[in-house]
Curated annotation (Swiss-Prot):
Its main location: cytoplasm. Feedback inhibited by histidine. GO terms for biological process: L-histidine biosynthetic process. It comes from Chlorobaculum parvum (strain DSM 263 / NCIMB 8327) (Chlorobium vibrioforme subsp. thiosulfatophilum). Pfam families: HisG (PF01634), HisG_C (PF08029). GO terms for molecular function: ATP binding; ATP phosphoribosyltransferase activity; magnesium ion binding. This is ATP phosphoribosyltransferase. It comes from the Bacteria. Its EC number is 2.4.2.17.
Amino acid sequence: MSNSNNVLKLGLPKGSLQDSTLELFANAGFHFSVQSRSYFPSIDDDELEAILIRAQEMARYVSQGAFDAGLTGKDWIIETDADVVEVADLVYSKASMRPVRWVLAVPESSPIQSVRDLEGKHIATEVVNITKKYLARNGVNASVEFSWGATEVKPPELADAIVEVTETGSSLRANKLRIVETILESNTKLIANKASWENPWKREKIENMAMLLQGAINAQGKVGLKMNAPKAGLNKLIESIPALRQPTISDLADNAWVAIEVIVDEKVVRHLIPDLKRAGAEGIFEYDINKLID
């Protein structure tokens, strides 16, 4: 058990990931309140202190011990060469529940078709180290310039190509850019300072947090269904349910009936409930799931 002196310093990503991160934590059971222009959210957990900071800087600060743990992308761990413990993969991003990609992109009219066509060219990017390593792996000599933002507008006048992050590619297409290659796929990770990870209390706190966050991600797009069904024809009814796991079946006072509970993808419910009703199920109700722990 912890005492009031035990506090875990947690870094949360500010910017594009902030809203989706706070929503994920809320689903995991941690409720933050962020005041306007404040970088210090309040939290309904006396054992946590949180600070909002850019994901690009997170791994460095966790490595240095400014934070015990934090959330940042795999890309920024690689870019900053941070020496941290990678506790858990948390596959979510600002607009979806899938990884993002760092891609090599050029103007639609560019003759560049592969990385080897970049010999002697100029590239703009926010991930200079990742890009230089990518060029070195492919034996290409090109200049790489750090971009402070709005990287998509730089080709062709200010750069021959860019290395930029994308979820859907829509921003690149809107700026008339074409993806040549994917350099790196990245997802959010929960990371820990190495010394903090060796502290038993902090490690348990971080591991518990990781479990709950992963459970919240697992529950995305899932709902629970409960119903009563007659034993007659039960096997056929069960076979019609596209469940993640075998349904839980419990006996009722009426020996001719059973109670069924199951977790399914929310997208199938609008078709599934009418099918279940026609198959003889009664008292069907649907409920939300915040966490699904394997």
